[in-house]
């Protein structure tokens, strides 16, 4: 995929002379483990710093999903109000705030970036540090062991994976549950989601690969679920106790085998699909080059789309984000495409809106149709070119 800037390296409009650093993205398949890995690692302190822009708390769909996770965890594991719940990579504390709303007060976030300050809004304890074996020892000493440990869209970002898992093992109770939720290899391939391959995402896991990995550190799988969140997610529950697996586990493993995740030809077809989409999208833009075209929503994955489909930046006038986003008044990394408030969309109605958060295409397009964009054509670049007139 060449060299690309970091997806979250947004440049303030007032600092437009600053240049982004480009890093390679090259994805490798491990046939034995059945997962994908970026062969270049950018340091954590570069990726996750005080200027990190992503906040789940400003997205209703994300908040709703995290509320569901909190509800299910409490119900399925008979969680008591005094049981310690630790969320690693807790960002602005949104997931933990859902536990608190449901009556659970013994909560701890672990967050290395500047978003940790938002835990204060919920009056939730937070450790402003990277999670590893060393920081886990401090957590264990001060807070004790956890009944529930969650990592939502964090595990695939982890650099020193062995040290991270050892840290989990150090702070989890014997009867505790470790919940991993991440983008899912099968859905990435099935839905042509090359946009998940940004520098923060070091690995893309199948269920088979997660089981194999966690068993090396003494964890047993208990439950596994897949969902359509973020274009396709997998949620896996591990414990230190030897337990009977949920029937879901073997069902998902059989689906992975039937799909061909262990067959290199599956990935060659995936690559071919992406190139076809690239051609179709270019032809669409070129045909409509006289139209007023904007992008809508800028999750990290959108940077990959814009750079791999490099012609897009020549057609898009700006990217619209919701008014509360920290990304407004910044440029898309490596471009002069400005991220502006979506309030502008009703003043300057676009002919075409390219929804870069394509996994929310139906929700976003319908919302803006109802808001007054009656004549706008809504476009999704993935999983294949889709146009809603």
Please describe what each predicted stretch is.
Residues 81-91, 293-296:
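Conserved class I S-adenosyl-L-methionine
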Residues 147-150:
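A conserved beta-strand element that flanks and buttresses the S-adenosyl-L-methionine
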Residues 162-177:
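A short glycine-rich, Lys/Arg-flanked "PGG" loop and its adjoining helix->strand segment in the class I
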Residues 1-60, 225:
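N-terminal juxtadomain amphipathic helix
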Residues 93-134, 315-330:
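Class I SAM-dependent methyltransferase SAM/SAH-binding core
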Residues 231-274:
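Flexible, glycine-/basic-rich loop-and-beta segments that form/coincide
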Residues 180-203, 207-209, 214:
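Short, glycine-/aromatic-enriched active-site segment of Class I SAM-dependent methyltransferases
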Residues 175-183, 377-383:
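Conserved beta-strand signature within the Rossmann-like core of class I S-adenosyl-L-methionine
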């Amino acid at each position: 995929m060449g060299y690309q800037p970091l997806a979250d390296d947004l440049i303030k409009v007032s600092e437009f002379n600053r240049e982004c650093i480009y890093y390679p993205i090259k994805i490798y398949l491990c046939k034995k483990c059945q997962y994908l890995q970026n062969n270049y690692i950018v340091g954590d302190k570069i990726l996750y710093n005080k200027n990190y822009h992503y906040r789940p708390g400003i997205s209703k769909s994300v908040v709703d999903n995290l509320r569901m996770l909190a509800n299910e965890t409490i119900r399925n594991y008979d969680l008591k109000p005094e049981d310690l719940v630790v969320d690693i990579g807790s960002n602005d504390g949104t997931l933990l705030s859902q536990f608190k709303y449901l009556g659970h007060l013994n909560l701890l976030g672990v967050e290395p970036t500047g978003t940790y300050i938002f835990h204060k809004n919920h009056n939730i304890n937070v450790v402003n540090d990277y999670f590893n074996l060393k920081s886990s020892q401090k957590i264990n000493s001060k807070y004790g062991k956890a009944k529930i440990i969650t990592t939502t869209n964090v595990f695939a970002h982890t650099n020193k994976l062995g040290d991270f898992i050892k840290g989990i093992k150090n702070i989890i109770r014997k009867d505790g549950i470790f919940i991993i939720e991440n983008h899912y290899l099968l859905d990435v391939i099935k839905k042509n989601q090359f946009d998940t391959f940004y520098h923060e995402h070091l690995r893309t896991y199948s269920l088979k690969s997660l089981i194999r990995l966690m068993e090396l550190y003494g964890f047993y799988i208990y439950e596994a679920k897949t969902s359509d969140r973020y274009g396709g997610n997998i949620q896996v529950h591990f414990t230190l106790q030897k337990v009977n697996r949920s029937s879901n586990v073997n069902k998902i493993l059989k689906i992975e085998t039937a799909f061909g995740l262990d067959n290199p030809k599956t990935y060659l077809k995936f690559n071919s699909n992406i190139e076809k989409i690239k051609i179709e999208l270019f032809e669409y833009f070129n045909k409509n080059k006289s139209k007023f075209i904007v992008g809508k929503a800028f999750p990290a994955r959108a940077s990959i789309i814009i750079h791999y489909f490099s012609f897009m930046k020549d057609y898009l006038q700006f990217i619209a984000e919701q008014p509360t986003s920290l990304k407004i008044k910044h440029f898309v990394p490596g471009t002069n495409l400005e991220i502006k408030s979506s309030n502008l969309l009703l003043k300057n109605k676009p002919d075409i809106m390219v929804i870069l958060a394509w996994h929310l295409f139906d929700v976003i397009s319908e919302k803006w149709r109802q808001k007054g964009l009656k004549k706008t054509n809504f476009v999704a670049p993935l999983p294949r070119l889709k146009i809603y007139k």
